[in-house]
């Protein structure tokens, strides 16, 4: 059966978008607010009608992730910011595989996400309350599956509880995207053997987005 590289590329961009948000937060203490909203909302929406629907139904919502994906696919150096992004992306994929083989953790994750939906009736998606709740899910359900993702950045920035919560919430969104990636036919071997196909697809999607002003 032929792979749907459009859906695979969208889901992979979702993982990369989370990785980029983590990097921005860890180094700067803030991140692309629109991209963060899209990624966090992907965790909450339990019944999307398509792969693109997970990310709000618009390719433009994944611009940051698509640009990051191209950087990861074409990274020649094992050092620097692209190496960081590659490490975060691969680590999220590893954790997702561990999650998918742990039925108890999957059930717990579903229950906790249902709880988030109830909180959304009273709090904004990017409120400290929701951020802390998402971070708590990551710490309680995902982190114990191991290995832990080592986030690197500014030590002063990473001491902030608000930044820590946003980083963990972004990692939770990355796990959501990694689950989706496998559901639509993604696999780590594609990063080695289908790099050109993924690069071409990501460039095609970016090409027909309206330029940012």
Swiss-Prot record:
SUPFAM superfamilies assigned to the protein according to its UniProt record, in alphabetical order: YcfC-like (SSF101322)
Domain of life: Bacteria
Coiled coil, from the record: 79-122
Compartments it resides in: Cytoplasm; Cell inner membrane
Keywords: Cell inner membrane, Cell membrane, Coiled coil, Cytoplasm, Membrane
Record's GO cellular component terms: cytoplasm; plasma membrane
Pfam families (UniProt xref): DUF489
Membrane topology, record value: Peripheral membrane protein
Family, as annotated: Belongs to the HflD family.
Name the record gives this protein: High frequency lysogenization protein HflD homolog
């Amino acid at each position: 059966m032929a792979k749907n590289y459009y859906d695979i590329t969208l889901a992979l961009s979702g993982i990369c978008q989370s990785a980029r948000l983590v990097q921005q937060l860890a180094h700067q203490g803030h991140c692309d607010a629109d991209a963060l909203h899209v990624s966090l909302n992907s965790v909450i929406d339990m019944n999307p009608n398509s792969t693109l629907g997970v990310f709000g139904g618009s390719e433009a919502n994944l611009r940051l992730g698509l640009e990051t994906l191209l950087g990861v696919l074409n990274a020649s150096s094992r050092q620097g910011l692209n190496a960081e992004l590659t490490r975060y992306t691969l680590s999220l994929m590893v954790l997702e595989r561990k999650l998918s083989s742990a039925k108890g953790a999957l059930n717990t994750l579903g229950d906790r996400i249902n709880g988030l939906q109830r909180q959304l009736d009273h709090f904004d998606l990017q409120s400290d309350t929701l951020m802390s709740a998402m971070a708590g899910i990551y710490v309680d359900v995902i982190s114990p599956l191991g290995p832990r993702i080592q986030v690197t950045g500014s030590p002063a920035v990473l001491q902030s509880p608000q930044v820590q919560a946003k980083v963990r919430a972004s990692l939770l969104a990355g796990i959501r995207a990694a689950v989706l990636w496998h559901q639509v036919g993604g696999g780590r071997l594609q990063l080695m053997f289908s790099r050109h196909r993924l690069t071409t697809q990501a460039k095609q999607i970016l090409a027909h987005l309206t330029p940012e002003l």
